[in-house]
Amino acid sequence: MKQTVYIASPESQQIHVWNLNHEGALTLTQVVDVPGQVQPMVVSPDKRYLYVGVRPEFRVLAYRIAPDDGALTFAAESALPGSPTHISTDHQGQFVFVGSYNAGNVSVTRLEDGLPVGVVDVVEGLDGCHSANISPDNRTLWVPALKQDRICLFTVSDDGHLVAQDPAEVTTVEGAGPRHMVFHPNEQYAYCVNELNSSVDVWELKDPHGNIECVQTLDMMPENFSDTRWAADIHITPDGRHLYACDRTASLITVFSVSEDGSVLSKEGFQPTETQPRGFNVDHSGKYLIAAGQKSHHISVYEIVGEQGLLHEKGRYAVGQGPMWVVVNAH
């Protein structure tokens, strides 16, 4: 398995393309100059395209991915109704979902043969919309509205329209600020990192049409931490055994172990990392974690080791200015 790591650096308007080898070492293979401040990125389900959101002219760009080395070639673009904060796709590669924090909306862009062709739906009134996350069964779009302490739930119709479910939302504790999410491989649990109180909620997905319950909330910070909380990103290993979340104020990655059924998280430790880690990701083998420092302009690669899933630094690399997003593609 070959793996390519993409790093988005909005301040220098670049995507750095790296080869990740089996020992966790990175080799720079390409630097792409992007026409705008590039932030969120996602690889298409068929691994043919990388979709990226750019500002200040709000657009989604599609780059064709070379199957041999992961190199990028611009392919298409489509306008967006707000500044892109987060980007994702459905599992069949029919739609791109874009959450916009500043515009307070989530939009759906239709794809034709992998290329974006236009927005088909926009839902407004989602204050602080920070991500759009399709459930493993491709039926429910989870959309955290950070400023409203709620996660809105939509069914995605065949033509890409978003239909509010019943119930239409789940709520967090006041002041939590739900931000990014991941799902357990067994498709029974979701995990949401809350930006404003730096906690992680575990949501049990009992029924795709309702009966969703928060079964655990864990503080992700050390006991003596008294500074402003500012959590950012969350990821889980492919085998579902280890979960990670980061806080930008503390420049820290919190390590969690996950119970066999996915219902219980246990805090295992903390890893100091790059300054202001806005984004990170786990590779497809589940052996390595790559974290980007928005203020350090570097990335660090960590090996995931032991039953606890603790992190051991393998290498550190300079990238563009203000790196914010990390995507890993296996090909």
UniProtKB/Swiss-Prot annotation:
Function: Catalyzes the hydrolysis of 6-phosphogluconolactone to 6-phosphogluconate.
GO molecular function: 6-phosphogluconolactonase activity
EC number: 3.1.1.31
Originating species: Escherichia coli (strain K12)
UniProt entry tagged with the keyword Hydrolase: yes
PANTHER family found in the cross-reference section: 6-PHOSPHOGLUCONOLACTONASE, 6-PHOSPHOGLUCONOLACTONASE-RELATED
Gene name tied to this protein: pgl
The protein, known as: 6-phosphogluconolactonase
EC class of the enzyme, as a word: hydrolase
Similarity comment: Belongs to the cycloisomerase 2 family.
Keywords: Acetylation, Carbohydrate metabolism, Glucose metabolism, Hydrolase
Reaction catalysed by this enzyme: 6-phospho-D-glucono-1,5-lactone + H2O = 6-phospho-D-gluconate + H(+)
Any one GO biological process: pentose-phosphate shunt
A GO cellular component annotation in the UniProt record: cytosol
Pfam families attached to this UniProt entry: Lactonase
Positions carrying N6-acetyllysine: K287
InterPro entries: 6-phosphogluconolactonase_YbhE (IPR022528), Cycloisomerase_2 (IPR050282), Lactonase_7-beta_prop (IPR019405), N2O_reductase_N (IPR011045), WD40/YVTN_repeat-like_dom_sf (IPR015943)
Pathway: Carbohydrate degradation; pentose phosphate pathway; D-ribulose 5-phosphate from D-glucose 6-phosphate (oxidative stage): step 2/3
